[in-house]
């Protein structure tokens, strides 16, 4: 507890250890962690950053890919931003719960959600079957009050019909110890949450801590851009774009498009 480790490689002419520590404390404070086991003022920060391998730099200096790998982008017509509805609703719920911390001081920073839909057809969600929301809360608050308020917040935020929806709010009944104090965190461990919520394949590479030379991030962003434009232009109801790269090579080693249930080389 009360520990942050930052490790990795950098390529920069300037490296300020004190500035990095300041950024870490500010980010933790901005999130809102001020609990006994994880407080921005009391963190022990272990900085293990070091210079990038010159062998890797050889490949990226001329805009080549920083590594090999597969990246996927996905888009569909389920929502106005061409994201799957389940992950879209999860994001809306959690953004609203975080906003409500201003009105309910007992809501603490660690929250997560899961939405289950039923479908009448591909790309046609029928209804919201279940909503799970686990909300970290202060110790002095009654669990039934937590469940009541969180369900009210969700119902106010989600405009879809929730008449037959089953709510699972803090299913264990208590969620006081949260964040890195309760569960060791590592950036990049939740790659499905960071993308499409299980609606699309994933190459395995995380986004966190990477700049544009790392195609795990920039390649995935480009694949999403391509998929979104295929769908938004009316050429498909859903589209998956797969790219692959080789380290040091500028152009993709392969491009694959799968839309509306079939391979679409024409796209």
Spans of model-derived segments:
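Alpha-helical support elements that line or immediately flank enzyme active sites
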Residues: 75, 79-95, 210-234
């Amino acid at each position: 507890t009360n520990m942050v480790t930052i490790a990795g490689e950098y390529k920069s002419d300037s490296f300020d250890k004190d500035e990095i520590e300041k950024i870490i404390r500010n980010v933790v404070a901005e999130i809102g962690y001020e609990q006994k086991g994880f407080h921005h003022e009391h963190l022990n920060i272990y900085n293990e950053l070091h210079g990038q391998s010159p062998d890797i730099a050889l490949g990226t200096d001329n805009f080549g890919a920083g590594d090999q790998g597969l990246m996927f982008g996905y888009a569909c017509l389920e929502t106005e931003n061409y994201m799957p509805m389940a992950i879209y609703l999860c994001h809306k719920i959690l953004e609203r719960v975080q906003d409500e911390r201003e009105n309910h001081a007992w809501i603490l920073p660690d929250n997560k959600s899961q939405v289950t839909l039923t479908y009448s057809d591909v790309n046609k969600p029928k209804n919201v079957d279940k909503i799970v929301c686990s909300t970290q809360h202060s110790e002095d608050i009654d669990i039934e009050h937590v469940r009541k308020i969180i369900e009210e917040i969700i119902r106010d935020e989600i405009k879809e019909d929730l008449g037959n929806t089953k709510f699972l709010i803090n299913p264990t009944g208590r969620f006081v110890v949260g964040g890195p104090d309760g569960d060791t965190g590592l950036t990049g461990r939740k790659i499905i949450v960071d993308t499409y919520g299980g609606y699309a394949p994933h190459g395995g590479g995380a986004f966190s801590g990477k700049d544009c030379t790392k195609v795990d991030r920039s390649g995935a962003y480009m694949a999403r851009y391509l998929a979104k434009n295929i769908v938004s232009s009316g050429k498909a109801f859903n589209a998956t774009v797969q790219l692959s790269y080789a380290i040091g090579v500028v152009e993709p080693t392969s491009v694959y498009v799968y839309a509306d249930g079939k391979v679409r080389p024409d796209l």
